Amino acid sequence: MASSLLTSSGMIPTTGSTVVGRSVLPFQSSLHSLRLTHSYKNPALFISCCSSVSKNAATSSTDLKPAVERWPEYLPNKLPDENYVRVFDTTLRDGEQAPGGSLTPPQKLEIARQLAKLRVDIMEVGFPGSSEEELETVKTIAKTVGNEVDEETGYVPVICAIARSKHRDIEAAWEAVKYAKRPRILIFTSTSDIHMKYKLKKTQEEVIEMAVSSIRFAKSLGFNDIQLGCEDGGRSDKDFLCKILGEAIKADVTVVNVADTVGINMPHEYAELVTYLKANTPGIDDVVFSVHCHNDLGLATANSIAGIRAGARQVEVTINGIGERSGNASLEEVVMALKCRGAYVINGVYTRIDTRQIMATSKMVQEYTGLYVQAHKPIVGANCFVHESGIHQDGILKNRSTYEILSPEDIGIVKSQNSGLVLGKLSGRHAVKDRLKELGYELDDEKLNAVFSLFRDLTKNKKRITDADMKALVTSSDGISLEKSNGANGLKSNGYIPVLQVSSNV
C-alpha cells in the first residue's frame, strides 16, 4: 500500500503522525487591526497561516508542531466555540454514489480508519436501510472505528448513518450505529416544491409531519444525536424551510442541514439562504447549522465557504469531491481554504483536521474507487506543486512562497526545494543550472550556455526533460542526435522511447 501512495515529481505523502493541530490560527482581522481570540503558547504558530504544522527534518530545521490539544467535549447541538467548524465527511455514503465508485466492505473499513487519522468530526458511513450487507458494514465500522478513542487527545469520531423518513430505515440505522460511542442518524426529506409534488407526492404539511414523526421515532430508539436534512433545500421556499426546521427543533433535532442537492445555487444566493434561515427560524441557535453542496456548476466549494461565512458551523464534504453527477464539495479544498483564509476573511473560523493526512487519504480513495483526480485538481492534483514556466521556476528557486500559497508538507507531502520543477520548453537558464547542480554538475558560464543551447534544441522534440537527458547533455561535447518524437514523454507513434545518442571526440 505504501508504494502506491507515491506521487509524481518526487513527492511522497507522510504517514503515521498523531499530533493534532488546528487547521488555522483562530483569530479575527480587519483592514486596520488584528485581534487574537485565543492564546497560544507557541509563537512559531504565527509565522504563517499557511505554513505547515510540522516541517520535515529534510526540508527544515524548524519544528512547528503545536502542543497536543485534548479534543473538546462533544455536545451534539453545541460547539466548543463560535468559530469552530465541524467537518462532516460523507465519502463513504454520498461519495460512494459516484458512478463507478462503489467500495467493498473491507475498503470502506480501511477508508474509515484513514478518515479517523484525518480527524474528521463526523463520518457518514452508509445507508443501512438499503441492504443487509450495507447494514453489516456500517455496524462493523461503528464497533471498531467508532470505539477507537485516541488516548492522547480523546478524539473519537461520530459515526452517522443516513435514513429516509421511514421507520424501517430508522430502525436499520439504529441497529447499525448503536455500537459506536457517538452514534448519529441523518434523516432526510425533500422540501422543494418539485420534489414534494413529483417525488413524494405530499403536501408541505404532510412532509412536516413525516419529518417530526421520524425524529420522535429515532429518539424513542435511543438516538440523542439527530440531524434533519432538507433535500433540494437550494430550490425550496425559504419560509417553508423556516417552518419545517422550526418544527424539527421543537422535536429535539440537534443538527439541521439545507442541501444544494442539484448544485444550482450561486455563492451569494446560498449565503443569503443561510442568513435568512438563521434569522427567521425559531430556536435555530439551539442546533448546529450544516451546509451540503453539490458541484454541478463547479461551485460546491465556493458555496460551502459562503455558507460558513453566513454562519453555518458544520460542512459536509467528500474526499476528492466525489459524489453523484459532478460530485460534492471537496474536503481538501474546503479545509485548506479555511486554513489559509479563514482567519483573515471569515472571522477566524477553523477546523481540527490533521491536514498532513490529506494526500494519503486522497490517494487511498482514488485507488479504491478507481476515480482518479485530474492533474490540476486543487490541493491533491499531481501538478499542484509543479512548475514549468521559467519565470515561475526562477521565483520558486528564490523563495517558494513567490508562486505557492500552500506548503506541500501541510498536506502530507515531503519534497525537496526543487523537486516540483519540471524541465521543458518554458524552463529558463536558472532552472537548468539549478537542476544540474542538484545532479552534481558545477558548470562555468561558457559550459552552461552550451548545455542550455542543447537543452533548448531538445525541448523542441521532447516535452519533459529527464535527469538522464540532463546528464547526457553535460557529457556531450559534439552535440546530440535525437530521433524525431512526439507525445508528452517523447513517444514515437510505435511506442518506442528515443534514447539520446551521444558522440564524443577523444
Swiss-Prot record:
Transit peptide start-stop: 1-49
Main location: plastid
GO CC annotations, alphabetized: chloroplast
Catalytic activity as recorded in UniProt: an omega-(methylsulfanyl)-2-oxoalkanoate + acetyl-CoA + H2O = a 2-(omega-methylsulfanyl)alkylmalate + CoA + H(+)
Stated consequence of mutating residue 479 to E: In strain: cv. Ka-0, cv. Lip-0, cv. No-0, cv. Sei-0, cv. Tsu-0 and cv. Wl-0
InterPro entries: 2-IPM_HCS-like, AIPM/Hcit_synth_CS, Aldolase_TIM, LeuA/HCS_post-cat, PYR_CT
Biological-process GO terms, alphabetical: biosynthetic process; carboxylic acid metabolic process
PANTHER family attached to this UniProt entry: HOMOCITRATE SYNTHASE-RELATED, METHYLTHIOALKYLMALATE SYNTHASE 1, CHLOROPLASTIC-RELATED
NCBIfam families: PRK00915.1-3
Misc remark: The gene encoding this protein is not present in cv. Aa-0, cv. Ag-0, cv. Columbia, cv. Ema-1, cv. Gy-0, cv. Mt-0 and cv. Pla-0.
Role noted for this protein: Catalyzes only the first methionine chain elongation cycle.
UniProt name for this protein: Methylthioalkylmalate synthase 2, chloroplastic
Gene for this chain: MAM2
